A protein has these predicted regions:
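A short linear-motif detector with a strong N-terminal bias
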Residues: 35-38, 92-95, 106-109
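Solvent-exposed, flexible loop/coil residues
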Residues: 25, 32-35, 92, 100, ...
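Conserved beta-strand-centric core segments of catalytic alpha/beta enzyme folds
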Residues: 97-148
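Short Gly/Pro-enriched loop/turn and capping motifs at secondary-structure junctions
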Residues: 63-65, 88-90, 120-122
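Active-site-adjacent helical/loop segments in soluble small-molecule enzymes
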Residues: 84-96
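Hydrophobic pocket-lining "lid/loop/helix" segments that shape and contact the acyl-thioester
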Residues: 1-84, 135-148
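Short amphipathic alpha-helical segments at helix boundaries and their inter-helical linkers
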Residues: 63-73, 94-100, 130
């Protein structure tokens, strides 16, 4: 049995194999601005809530354009969607705790937050948390790194 990956030329003229990660950006974008708003609106219906019931929306920081589209489609004011992608980029599943640490560590307050992660494998989910922000740690920056 040969377990070596087979190289193939893809439609974008790049040679890839099963070990290479490749995302179909437009499909993920369409998913993000179509399925995620539906998920959020379905959540409102299921929980008998609306956008006004949450202090902030902690959303996966895919890109700013997607965040703005979600804001528009779900009628969420942008000032209720903290943004960290401009400073930290797309951190995948880490983007939600990163937003929490970036925006809420300095001042203790009780908040009701809507959280939603979406992306890899076209997966998505959402929920709410009630939190006192004094339990959120600040971001720790360091020059340390791990050697292979």
């Amino acid at each position: 049995m040969d377990l070596q990956p087979v190289d193939e030329l893809w439609s974008d003229d790049i040679v890839r194999n099963d070990y290479n990660t490749h995302m179909k950006g437009m499909a993920v974008f369409e998913f993000s601005i179509t399925d995620v708003p539906k998920l959020i609106n379905d959540f409102y219906k299921e929980t008998n809530t609306s956008s006004e019931d949450y202090h902030y929306y902690i959303l996966h920081q895919a890109n700013l354009y997607i965040l703005k589209q979600l804001s528009r489609k779900c009628k969420i004011p942008m000032d209720k969607i903290p943004v960290s992608i401009d400073r930290f980029g797309n951190n995948s599943s880490n983007s939600i705790p990163l937003v929490l640490s970036d925006h809420f560590h300095a001042k203790a307050q009780d908040l009701r937050l809507f959280i939603s992660g979406f992306g890899a494998g076209l997966s998505w989910g959402c929920g709410t948390i009630n939190i006192n922000t004094d339990v959120i740690f600040p971001i720790v920056e360091s020059d340390e790194f791990y050697k292979d």
